[in-house]
Amino acid sequence: MLKVNEYFDGNVKSIGFEQKGDKATVGVMEAGDYQFNTAAPERMTVVKGALTIQLADEDEWHTYSQGQSFEVAGHSSFKLEVKTPTAYLCEFLD
């Protein structure tokens, strides 16, 4: 079953799904600054565009482009700077 999610006044939208017990979402972020909290560990892969991120326990910002991934610990948070509309895949690692 597909689950549609919408955040930040519709500027971030995703569709959640399960495949063989693995949970994931695919979505698009409009340009903007965002902060997300995580319940479970997750891996974010940039499908198209770029995401500049700052993990909760780091001072530095890192930019990830098409095909690149980063992981975020569970029970944590991360900040995002999105300069152009960007598509992503989020895989939940628990």
Curated annotation (Swiss-Prot):
Recorded GO MF terms: guanosine phosphorylase activity; purine-nucleoside phosphorylase activity; thymidine phosphorylase activity; uridine phosphorylase activity
Pfam families per UniProt: Ppnp
Catalytic activity from the UniProt record: a purine D-ribonucleoside + phosphate = a purine nucleobase + alpha-D-ribose 1-phosphate; adenosine + phosphate = alpha-D-ribose 1-phosphate + adenine; cytidine + phosphate = cytosine + alpha-D-ribose 1-phosphate; guanosine + phosphate = alpha-D-ribose 1-phosphate + guanine
Keyword Transmembrane: no
The enzyme's E.C. designation: 2.4.2.1, 2.4.2.2
InterPro entries: Ppnp (IPR009664), RmlC-like_jellyroll (IPR014710), RmlC_Cupin_sf (IPR011051)
Domain of life of the source: Bacteria
Any one GO CC term of the record: cytosol
Enzyme class: transferase
Keyword set, alphabetical order: Glycosyltransferase, Transferase
Family membership noted in the UniProt record: Belongs to the nucleoside phosphorylase PpnP family.
Function noted in UniProt: Catalyzes the phosphorolysis of diverse nucleosides, yielding D-ribose 1-phosphate and the respective free bases. Can use uridine, adenosine, guanosine, cytidine, thymidine, inosine and xanthosine as substrates. Also catalyzes the reverse reactions.
Name listed for the protein in its UniProt record: Pyrimidine/purine nucleoside phosphorylase
